[in-house]
């Protein structure tokens, strides 16, 4: 029988509930418990797949093809456990399910209401994760802030949940903020007291308080908070601002968060094994020489839009004893100012995914710069499509080459709509989504990096390489190093006689893990460390023993 942890947040939004939930998952796993984490988002969208990256940040794709909140990426990276579509719940998906049941007559003519029907559906979703994952502990992060009207059905549902299970099968963790007032020189507890009061008014008494602060919290303050909030002082956990999100699990362990959770759940407090995580944090705090990486995108004003890409770069740098010096380059600025001005001095260039016309010419210019100046390059999804367009225009002689998405009237649509997408009308959840196999060609950089014949990668796209141009581009020097097993879909391309130039149709960033960097990102960083060689004979060699050839596990 699974145990359940509910993580709520108060005082302000973006308090760090996702990192707390992911960190707790890491700590529980280090003690031998299996964990699954789900996110309950209070917005009315069915999923974030159609939301602007400026509104929501990155859309994280699970192996079964769900478009989810970026927090699921944190859950997977911290616990090294694959989540599924069941781990992402929104108000929109709950209401959609309840309305569909009402239309089918499942409620036998009863009046359908928020209580009990919506709250029961929420509880069933949580239990479904427990049943399908078989996890010892299921952690649920409730999005939003206590006091928001949007979160009320979820808070009511988790209040009701304690009536479905034994008391020691559920624990409530509330994350709050302790602001410091400089003029008085004091840390203020009143916002936390009021947040807990609001939570109590709903019927939830938190068992544990995780208090965010930018300065240490002494025992006297913990006793005060515990006394006013009805929580044991040992269960008042200080969470100080950290130098890295990866140091948070160790800090929370030292504060006793995991012990308090295990005590509440009546679980044995086994010896923890965090040696690998401690080594990871040590390397983060003691990096080697910096590597300048340009991330050329169209959503760079919001860093969260490329969260998994940044984390994958960070994982690769940790593995190769490098310090990531990330430069955010707006693709539109390249169009107006030129690639040389903005990319001069970069050790590597990454062009990530995206949609639409804006900034595409800047991405193509950046790719041309990487190719001609022999700067290590990695293209992801749209980044691969732009790389194909750049080569077709400037090397293969197809001046009008483009994507059918960007220019429907192009004479040479080297990127076109997938056949199965021709009659698709709805935007949400209709792309090529989730894990698909990719067969790698022997004696290529891609195959050497993966050290596998077939790999499994996550996709999110509607457009694909147009096979009508495959022969022409290959004859002009393009290398197709990975395809679908039937050879129909081009998944991975690269160039010979270049230090490192590789691009993929999929999203490898979703499979990168701390301590287990994705091979493509690892190859990019190693090539960047070597810098730009002066001749092809000095080019990056993927057979080098320096590379950690860690194959992807089939999820």
From Swiss-Prot:
<dbReference type="InterPro" id="IPR033828">
    <property type="entry name" value="GATase1_CTP_Synthase"/>
</dbReference>
<keyword id="KW-0315">Glutamine amidotransferase</keyword>
<feature type="binding site">
    <location>
        <begin position="188"/>
        <end position="193"/>
    </location>
    <ligand>
        <name>UTP</name>
    </ligand>
</feature>
<feature type="binding site">
    <location>
        <position position="224"/>
    </location>
    <ligand>
        <name>CTP</name>
    </ligand>
</feature>
<feature type="binding site">
    <location>
        <position position="13"/>
    </location>
    <ligand>
        <name>UTP</name>
    </ligand>
</feature>
<dbReference type="GO" id="GO:0044210">
    <property type="term" value="P:'de novo' CTP biosynthetic process"/>
</dbReference>
<comment type="function">
    <text>Catalyzes the ATP-dependent amination of UTP to CTP with either L-glutamine or ammonia as the source of nitrogen. Regulates intracellular CTP levels through interactions with the four ribonucleotide triphosphates.</text>
</comment>
<feature type="region of interest" description="Amidoligase domain">
    <location>
        <begin position="1"/>
        <end position="267"/>
    </location>
</feature>
<dbReference type="GO" id="GO:0005524">
    <property type="term" value="F:ATP binding"/>
</dbReference>
<comment type="similarity">
    <text>Belongs to the CTP synthase family.</text>
</comment>
<feature type="compositionally biased region" description="Basic and acidic residues">
    <location>
        <begin position="546"/>
        <end position="555"/>
    </location>
</feature>
<dbReference type="GO" id="GO:0003883">
    <property type="term" value="F:CTP synthase activity"/>
</dbReference>
<feature type="binding site">
    <location>
        <position position="71"/>
    </location>
    <ligand>
        <name>ATP</name>
    </ligand>
</feature>
<keyword id="KW-0665">Pyrimidine biosynthesis</keyword>
<dbReference type="GO" id="GO:0004359">
    <property type="term" value="F:glutaminase activity"/>
</dbReference>
<dbReference type="GO" id="GO:0046872">
    <property type="term" value="F:metal ion binding"/>
</dbReference>
<feature type="active site" description="Nucleophile; for glutamine hydrolysis">
    <location>
        <position position="381"/>
    </location>
</feature>
<feature type="domain" description="Glutamine amidotransferase type-1">
    <location>
        <begin position="292"/>
        <end position="534"/>
    </location>
</feature>
<feature type="binding site">
    <location>
        <position position="405"/>
    </location>
    <ligand>
        <name>L-glutamine</name>
    </ligand>
</feature>
<feature type="binding site">
    <location>
        <position position="224"/>
    </location>
    <ligand>
        <name>UTP</name>
    </ligand>
</feature>
<feature type="binding site">
    <location>
        <position position="141"/>
    </location>
    <ligand>
        <name>Mg(2+)</name>
    </ligand>
</feature>
<feature type="binding site">
    <location>
        <begin position="14"/>
        <end position="19"/>
    </location>
    <ligand>
        <name>ATP</name>
    </ligand>
</feature>
<keyword id="KW-0547">Nucleotide-binding</keyword>
<feature type="binding site">
    <location>
        <position position="71"/>
    </location>
    <ligand>
        <name>Mg(2+)</name>
    </ligand>
</feature>
<keyword id="KW-0067">ATP-binding</keyword>
<comment type="pathway">
    <text>Pyrimidine metabolism; CTP biosynthesis via de novo pathway; CTP from UDP: step 2/2.</text>
</comment>
<feature type="binding site">
    <location>
        <begin position="148"/>
        <end position="150"/>
    </location>
    <ligand>
        <name>CTP</name>
    </ligand>
</feature>
<feature type="active site">
    <location>
        <position position="509"/>
    </location>
</feature>
<dbReference type="InterPro" id="IPR017456">
    <property type="entry name" value="CTP_synthase_N"/>
</dbReference>
<feature type="binding site">
    <location>
        <begin position="382"/>
        <end position="385"/>
    </location>
    <ligand>
        <name>L-glutamine</name>
    </ligand>
</feature>
<keyword id="KW-0479">Metal-binding</keyword>
<protein>
    <recommendedName>
        <fullName>CTP synthase</fullName>
        <ecNumber>6.3.4.2</ecNumber>
    </recommendedName>
</protein>
<dbReference type="GO" id="GO:0042802">
    <property type="term" value="F:identical protein binding"/>
</dbReference>
<feature type="binding site">
    <location>
        <position position="354"/>
    </location>
    <ligand>
        <name>L-glutamine</name>
    </ligand>
</feature>
<keyword id="KW-0460">Magnesium</keyword>
<feature type="active site">
    <location>
        <position position="507"/>
    </location>
</feature>
<dbReference type="GO" id="GO:0005829">
    <property type="term" value="C:cytosol"/>
</dbReference>
<dbReference type="Pfam" id="PF06418">
    <property type="entry name" value="CTP_synth_N"/>
</dbReference>
<dbReference type="Pfam" id="PF00117">
    <property type="entry name" value="GATase"/>
</dbReference>
<dbReference type="InterPro" id="IPR029062">
    <property type="entry name" value="Class_I_gatase-like"/>
</dbReference>
<keyword id="KW-0436">Ligase</keyword>
<comment type="subunit">
    <text>Homotetramer.</text>
</comment>
């Amino acid at each position: 029988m699974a145990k359940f942890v509910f993580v709520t947040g108060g005082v302000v939004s973006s308090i760090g509930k996702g990192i707390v939930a992911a960190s707790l998952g890491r700590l529980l796993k280090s003690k031998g418990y299996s964990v699954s984490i789900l996110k309950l988002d209070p917005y009315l969208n069915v999923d974030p797949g159609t939301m602007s990256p400026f509104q929501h940040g990155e859309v994280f794709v699970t192996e079964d093809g769900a478009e989810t909140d970026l927090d699921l990426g944190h859950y997977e990276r911290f616990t090294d456990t694959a989540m599924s579509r069941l781990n992402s719940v929104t108000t929109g998906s709950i209401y959609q399910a309840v309305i569909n049941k009402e239309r089918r007559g499942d409620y036998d003519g009863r009046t359908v209401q928020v209580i009990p029907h919506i709250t029961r559906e929420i509880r069933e979703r949580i239990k479904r994760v427990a049943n399908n994952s078989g996890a010892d502990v299921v952690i649920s992060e409730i999005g939003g802030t206590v006091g928001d009207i949007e979160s009320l059905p979820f808070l009511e549902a988790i209040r009701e949940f304690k009536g479905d299970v034994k008391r020691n099968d559920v624990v409530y963790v509330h994350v709050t903020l302790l602001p410091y007032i400089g003029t008085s020189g004091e840390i203020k507890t009143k916002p936390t007291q009021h947040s807990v009061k609001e939570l109590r008014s709903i019927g939830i008494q938190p068992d544990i308080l995780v208090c965010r602060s930018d300065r240490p919290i002494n025992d006297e303050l913990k006793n005060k908070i515990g006394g006013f909030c009805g929580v044991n002082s040992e269960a008042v956990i200080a969470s100080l601002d950290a130098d890295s999100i990866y140091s948070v699990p160790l800090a929370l362990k030292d504060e006793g968060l995991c012990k308090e959770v295990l005590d509440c759940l009546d679980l044995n407090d086994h010896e923890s094994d965090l040696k690998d995580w401690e080594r990871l944090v040590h390397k983060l705090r003691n990096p080697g020489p910096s590597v300048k990486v340009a991330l050329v995108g169209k959503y760079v004003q919001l860093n969260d839009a490329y969260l998994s890409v940044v984390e994958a770069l960070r994982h690769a740098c940790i593995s190769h004893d490098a310090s990531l010096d990330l430069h955010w380059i707006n693709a539109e600025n390249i169009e107006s100012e030129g690639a040389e001005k903005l990319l001069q001095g970069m050790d590597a260039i990454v062009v990530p995914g995206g949609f639409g016309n804006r900034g595409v010419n800047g991405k193509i210019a950046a790719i041309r710069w990487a190719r001609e100046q022999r700067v290590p390059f990695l293209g992801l999804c749209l980044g691969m499509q732009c790389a194909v367009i750049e080569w077709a225009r400037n090397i293969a002689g197809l001046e009008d080459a483009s994507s059918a998405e960007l220019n429907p009237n192009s004479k040479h649509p080297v990127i076109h709509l997938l056949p199965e997408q021709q009659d698709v009308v709805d935007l949400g959840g209709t792309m090529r989504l989730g894990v698909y196999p990719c067969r790698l060609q022997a004696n290529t950089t891609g195959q050497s990096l993966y050290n596998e014949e077939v790999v499994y990668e996550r996709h999110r796209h509607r457009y694909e390489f147009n096979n009508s141009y495959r022969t022409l581009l290959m004859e002009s020097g393009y290398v197709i190093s990975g395809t679908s097993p039937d050879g129909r879909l081009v998944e991975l391309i690269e160039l010979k006689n270049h230090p490192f130039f590789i691009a993929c149709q999929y999203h490898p960033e979703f499979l990168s893990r701390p301590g287990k960097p994705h091979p493509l990102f690892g190859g990019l960083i190693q090539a960047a460390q070597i810098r730009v060689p002066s001749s092809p004979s000095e080019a990056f060699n993927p057979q080098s023993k320096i590379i950690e050839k860690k194959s992807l596990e089939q999820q």
